[in-house]
Regions:
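Extended, folded cores of ATP/NTP-driven motor/assembly subunits in large transport
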Residues: 2-283
């Protein structure tokens, strides 16, 4: 018995001699990579741009979709190995922001300085009447620590209810009800109405950060789409009395989901983070 335990202990010692160094090397490499990425991000210079579009300019939401198509040019299509793992280079993002204070609503784009020309040209391409100005960061109007004795804050982040390839309701669903530009439904109108009624020193900030993505950087929507469609089709299978497997015809709802997934897969892809913050003086 003692010799058996001793043999196990010797085997464990041999394994540990190999496993511990490998674990420590992997841990060191991971921590080093995190540190390098932090250094890379700290070196980036950012511009805050205020976008002003005349209120009498009528554009369909399709124009903004084209803006995003232009901004997809920020995509690296996969950084080379040395910049990615030795220098900590990561794909940067652009943030589209709405800031309301006391009933005044402003639109901003926060962009890395290296992407500024691309962002401006993408906006001007669809909104030639727009005015793009370099602006101060509105966040700096408030203390760096919130909540405090003067201000209270509430915030939340949003995420998709289903997996990313599933379709969501977009401007096209609103446009189809009323093709007339003057009468079409504006899905943002209720939000802007609420923001326009803020009291003095009340603030609402909405920030949507987008980073271009795709198969070269690890997200293959075609593969994900195939899995979901296969899962939907598998759920339509049923066995008859003889045990023979048959597939029920897809319902109209199922057909619309599959159509929406395929349409989404044909678009430029972005990873996104959506945040909402409400800040007000303490009563």
């Amino acid at each position: 018995m003692d010799s058996f335990i001793y043999s196990i202990w010797q085997a464990l010692e041999i394994v540990l001699w190999f496993a511990v160094p490998i674990f420590l090397i992997a841990l060191f490499w991971r921590l080093r990579l995190i540190h390098k990425r932090q250094q890379f991000l700290e070196k980036q210079e950012w511009d805050m741009l205020e976008v002003r579009i005349p209120s009498n300019i009528i554009k369909r939401p399709k124009a903004m979709e084209q803006v995003f198509s232009g901004i997809y040019g920020i995509y690296s299509f996969g950084n080379p190995w040395i910049p990615k793992y030795m220098e900590g280079k990561v794909d940067l993002w652009v943030s589209f922001e709405i800031a309301a204070k006391g009933g005044s609503i402003r639109f901003y784009v926060r962009t890395p300085k290296s992407f500024r020309n691309l962002v401006e040209s993408s906006i001007y391409g669809q909104y030639p009447e727009a005015e793009i100005l370099e602006a101060e960061d509105y966040v700096h109007e408030l203390p760096s620590s919130l909540p405090n004795e003067t201000f209270d804050i509430w915030g939340t982040g949003f995420k998709l209810a289903n997996e990313a390839p599933y379709p969501i309701r977009t401007y096209k669903e609103f446009d189809e009800f009323e093709p007339d530009d003057e009468k079409r439904i504006d899905p943002m109108s209720a939000l802007f109405e609420a923001m326009s009624k803020l009291q003095q020193n009340e603030r609402i900030w909405i920030q949507c950060m987008v980073s271009a993505t795709g198969k070269p950087t690890g997200y293959d929507i075609q593969e994900e789409m195939g899995k979901i469609i296969q899962d939907i089709q598998d759920k339509s299978k049923e066995a008859d009395k003889e045990g023979k497997i048959t597939r029920k015809p897809p319902t109209h709802g199922t057909q619309e989901i599959i159509k929406g997934i395929e349409n989404k897969a044909s678009k430029h892809l972005f990873q996104f983070t959506l945040r909402f913050l409400y800040i007000a003086p303490k009563e």
